[in-house]
Amino acid sequence: MNTGYFKSFDGSDIFYREWNFQPNQKTLIIIHRGHEHSERLHEIATDAQFEGYNIFAYDLRGHGYTKEPVSPIFMDNVRDLDMFSKYLHHQYQIDEQDIFVIANSIAGVIVTSWVHDFAPAIAGMALLAPAFEIKLYVPFANEFIGFTTKLKKDLVIQSYVKSKVLTHDKAQQEAYDQDPLISKSINGRLLVDLQSAGKRLVEDAAAINIPTLILSAEKDYVVKNSVQKKFYVDLESQVKEFRTMTNFFHGILFESGRHEVYQYIKTFVVKSFELEPNELSLAPDLFSVKEYENLYYKVMPTMEKLNFAFQKWSLGKIGTLSEGMALGLKYGFDSGISLDYVYHNQAKGKFGIGKVIDKGYLEAIGWRGIRIRKQHLLTLLEKNIQDIQSSGRKVKILDIAGGTGNYLFDIKERYPDVEIVINEFVESNISLGEKIIHQKGYSHIRFTNFDCFDPKTYQLINFEPNITIISGIFELFGDNQLTNKAVQGIVSISEENSHILYTGQPWHPQLKMIAFVLNSHQKKDWVMRRRSQKELDRIMAFNHIKKEDMLIDDYGIFTVSSGKVKG
């Protein structure tokens, strides 16, 4: 066994272990349950059944030999896993498709989130008693913890879980009780965030289609195995198995019958690695098509219809008091003008109450996510600019649907020598943007007015970009044939080894409200067909664009990805 540290997304040093590494072997990543650490995985890592695999494990933040404290943000754990996968690729030349992940309890939720939100092309996953919903025996405990964390952000809760409800094995109970690296506490905010993430992932299980094995403990006093069953049923995976481990407690890898667990995992791992990769296609995810049709045809209970109808009526009556709502009602809540207002994030309104309403409007989770998306877009855009500059090339940026220009003016301020073309279909947005260009005296930046979904028009732009931005436009059009035409047009004019930045919206908690209350720039209901991250990445891969980097907000709503056009 060897040990080391890898740098995570925020510069944190995360401790990891490696067993039996040999080039060209398939790889297993095993992630420990909460409170534990990677050293406790030594038995499974050295079991004869797995001797033909590279085995890696790391200590989660605040666990084992990782000195970085626990993050209260669940998504940080998912980002760590994504960075570990990248580290294995750069350090050990291990590709994603050669990785299978095994995870127990909370780690099962982390892996599921990685698969759902980042869409890695891994071979499969085994979830052992995944903690999609934790059993809290005190009534309203989750609500109380959530409220308390508002008052005390660093709230720490002592775990009620004893070794005797984790395993029947007396030796394993004793080892757990005497291990000085076992942590008995959990961050209160992390617990609340974990519960929210688990609920989101179970509700959206249909977005996952990789091979999945779930081993559920029959006598689990820590998490609800009924929720695991719901998750399993909704999975879109063609290869999936659910096994209830008779008489098992929650700590499945440490139970008396754990060698039976090893056998189930080994059999499923072999099966997963033998599968041929799915052919690339532009076919949409069927679950999201059905979801869109339900929204479009308003298939819902009568009381729900009445609720949204009342919200829409209220918006029309008092929405004009809020500056942001008034702009949305006039131009469409998805319009460039409306988004500019959201980006500026300065509450305005009439008669005092309007400003209060506007502040609440701007603080909606979707708009908060939109502002984070802008930050993430600028982060990856600057990274791409520096990559182009380091190769001695002139930076040439194209935004295929840039609205009024917005963040590209920020880029022009920081990098005055870059050449920028902003394509935009709405002429009123162009007028606003050109006014800013004139006022600021910018050079080497211009607008064009073409249909970004017509591949023939890209030649008319008369530009050869090495960075192209697709921001917020694909989310408004659910037709993959249409979006594919745009990507074809981009690739047809791009420089060799150019970057493509594209945004996604794999999940949204307010999708129904948006559809039935807010109007679009087309003066219609703003009904969207969301794309899973894997579907969006598939459109890019179909056009020989390989994703290299991705950022996502803490809520799991908006993503920004960076890919490179393969020569």
Show the residue positions of the predicted features.
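Catalytic nucleophile-loop/oxyanion-hole region of alpha/beta-hydrolase
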Residues: 35-37, 64-95
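Conserved alpha/beta-hydrolase
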Residues: 45-68
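Short alpha-helix in the alpha/beta-hydrolase fold that links the catalytic acid
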Residues: 210, 224-233
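Class I (Rossmann-like) S-adenosyl-L-methionine-dependent methyltransferase catalytic domain
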Residues: 361-364, 378-383, 406-419, 425-444, ...
